[in-house]
């Protein structure tokens, strides 16, 4: 029994994801697949286009056996926290043999070598780094330069660390090294066209191009373009959600809620929220005063230092009321602390009984039971998860599905 | 020079308003008309269908000469506060000779007699009242019974005080008496069909039937039904707003903002807001958790004691962050303290120069100047006005008009 772990968002599940899933099984020789998936809000600081239960169905119908939720506090965080949270879950459940991630580079040894340097920080690397920092370079620039020097230019560092999936991959590898995990990392070279993620370009298109297509098309039933770039089961699940009036959910739907919150606050109040560092509160305030759309709001806060995804995560933090204090409290944990099951198939059921034996963290099958018994900090974390969903569902087109408390009422997906 | 004062909402201005305006001029013999009008939020605790500047245009084009804003803290308040705020402004500007209001009863003497009893509280009335309260009657029921006894059944008290415009009229009369105003009150019997305010019934229809019609029809240009029940100038202004994408604004537009705010709060936090008395916080909380629409939210909070309009005002208070503390502070004033000009015509300009000489309260022509010079409590009141508009404009369909600060940038309407 070989178990493969995948770290995913599936927003929504498309042919590229299917390719990755099938190739990963092939190269690992694994016969079971566990996915750790972000929930109703994703790493970019946006709501997912359809909820996590629908995306769980997509994953299971495409070959995943078990889907575990990456808690919001890890899912909607920087690449480093996202990666370490997901890796910790896959490690802590005690049954995963391989992790396979997509990367632009495609060679796990090189990426892992970089991860090793960054985790172990050998003396000469550290002195290169210090030198560059003393020269006035920013931390990322100093790190890049130190890596180049340390590897004696044997690796094309700038090219590798300029690609988002390589960066994320290195973070997975760092996380595995830090916890001395026995999980074997693998990577698959990404085959999608990264030069054009804006538009659907063929059978393999980016998730963002698909979301963009959905936001501009008004398809509510069968759609040629989506059928070309997503597995049929995914398209069916997507339209099942749309026709029920549960989505598509877009960040734009949060314009009134987020902007009105900020318009009501003073810059000093904005300052209290997570990741709002000095000066940014004024940018956020004046952006909310002038912005007519969510996109405008984000764009007018962004700077070179504050990237779009970082700004989006900050705004979602404001939406959910996550203060710097909360963040301090939540980050006292170095791991997600629990594995919440979103769905499984019959093979996943076998995995669950293995996990029950081997996991070092509790398995959460029923949130209402778990929340009663857990400690206060974990409780705050779960309350955040519950609130996030209570706010997410308000964006549904169909009022009948906007009820709060769906984290308690929604059943685990069993396929 | 005779000046007539009208207290209005014009949401939107229709034939019934025109009839009232013209009849009032006729019976008073006045040659000038000053309107005190609620702003972007109205007495029922709802946003106005189009903004106050558009409604000012409607008023001026229908025969009003000067429009003064009733500040939010009075406009979105109980009949008593609404009436006393509006009457105080008309009194304090020092030039108004008559106030003429619509009433179901139509006889100002009878209404004023009731007002006199309620203001002066003669001994025998007071003892009737005490008796009924001691018998366990609610205050409104005890008052009704005491009035019946005091007037020795010479007036049909129950019939009079069961009609909303009589009630409001009595409040105007009470306010005039309390401040010993020299303004002469007049009333006109309302001619609209009160038995059916749900649907447009003819050339005189209620404002709520017109709003309902607009919410269900999708007219964005000329419309037969509206043309039948509103003056042409009003219809034109309405469609000018709609086609620019500034409205129609409905309370339903506030569903995500208000509901998400409440979903984030504990009942204890809800308790801090204005007019939320013991126990209501739990109703509000659970209503927000289950409601899929604003209408549902309101309906599930209402009780016999908490009427729909009261609940709506409470929800708007939560939206704007008005706490009980704020309310205590704001109600330290017994009058609006200033007269903010929304618009005028050439005759209104003449009035303004008279007001400048005779008014006991400052005339606000430029908010940015006034807010700098006023005292802290008044400043809080104005900030509330500014915030209300900053939140109101976010509901516009056209993102270009959603900017904050329109209280500062919008010019006075001069026609």
Curated annotation (Swiss-Prot), chains A, B:
Gene from which this protein is expressed: tmcAL
Annotated keywords: ATP-binding, Cytoplasm, Ligase, Nucleotide-binding, RNA-binding, tRNA processing, tRNA-binding
Name this polypeptide is given: tRNA(Met) cytidine acetate ligase
Keyword Transferase applies: no
Lineage, broadest ranks: Bacteria, Bacillati, Bacillota, Clostridia, Eubacteriales
Top-level taxon: Bacteria
Location relative to the cell: Cytoplasm
Pfam families cross-referenced by the UniProt entry: HIGH_NTase1
Coiled-coil zones: none
Residues binding ATP, per UniProt: 7-20, 102, 165, 190-191
Reactions the enzyme catalyzes: cytidine(34) in elongator tRNA(Met) + acetate + ATP = N(4)-acetylcytidine(34) in elongator tRNA(Met) + AMP + diphosphate
Organism, as annotated: Acetivibrio thermocellus (strain ATCC 27405 / DSM 1237 / JCM 9322 / NBRC 103400 / NCIMB 10682 / NRRL B-4536 / VPI 7372)
Enzyme Commission code: 6.3.4.-
Record-stated family: Belongs to the TmcAL family.
């Amino acid at each position: 029994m070989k178990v493969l772990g995948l770290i995913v968002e599936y927003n929504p599940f498309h042919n590229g994801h299917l390719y990755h899933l099938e190739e990963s099984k092939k190269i690992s020789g694994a016969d079971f697949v566990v996915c750790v998936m972000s929930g109703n809000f994703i790493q970019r600081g946006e709501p997912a286009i359809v909820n996590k239960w629908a995306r769980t169905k997509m994953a299971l119908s495409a070959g995943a056996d078990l889907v575990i939720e990456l808690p919001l506090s890890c899912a909607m965080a920087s690449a480093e926290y996202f990666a370490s949270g997901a890796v910790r879950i896959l490690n802590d459940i005690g049954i995963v043999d391989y992790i396979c991630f997509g990367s632009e580079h495609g060679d796990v040894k090189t990426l892992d070598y970089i991860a090793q340097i960054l985790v172990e920080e050998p003396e000469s690397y550290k002195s290169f780094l210090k030198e560059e920092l003393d020269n006035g370079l920013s931390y990322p620039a100093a790190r890049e330069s130190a890596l180049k020097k340390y590897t004696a230019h044997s690796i094309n560092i700038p090219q590798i660390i300029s690609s988002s999936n390589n960066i994320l991959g290195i973070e997975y590898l760092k996380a595995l090294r830090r916890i001395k995990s026995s999980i074997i990392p693998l990577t698959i070279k990404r085959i999608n066209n990264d030069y054009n993620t804006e538009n659907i370009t063929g059978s393999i298109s980016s998730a963002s191009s698909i979301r963009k297509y959905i936001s501009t098309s008004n398809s509510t039933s069968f759609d040629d373009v989506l059928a070309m770039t997503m597995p049929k089961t995914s398209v069916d699940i997507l339209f099942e959600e749309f026709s029920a009036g549960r989505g598509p959910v877009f960040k734009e739907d949060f314009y009134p809620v987020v902007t009105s919150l900020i318009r009501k606050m003073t810059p000093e109040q904005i300052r209290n929220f997570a990741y709002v560092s000095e000066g940014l509160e004024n940018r956020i305030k004046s952006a909310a005063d002038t912005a007519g759309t969510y996109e405008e709001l984000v764009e007018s806060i962004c700077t070179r230092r504050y990237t779009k995804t970082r700004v989006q995560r900050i705004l979602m933090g404001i939406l959910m009321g996550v203060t710097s204090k909360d963040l301090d409290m939540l980050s006292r944990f170095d791991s997600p602390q629990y594995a919440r099951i979103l769905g499984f198939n019959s093979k996943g059921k076998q995995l669950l009984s293995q996990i029950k034996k081997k996991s070092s963290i509790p398995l959460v099958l029923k949130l209402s039971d778990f929340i009663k018994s857990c400690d206060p900090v974990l409780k705050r974390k779960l309350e955040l998860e519950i609130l996030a969903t209570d706010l997410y569902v308000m964006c549904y087109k169909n009022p009948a599905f906007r009820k709060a408390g769906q984290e308690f009422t929604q059943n685990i997906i069993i396929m």
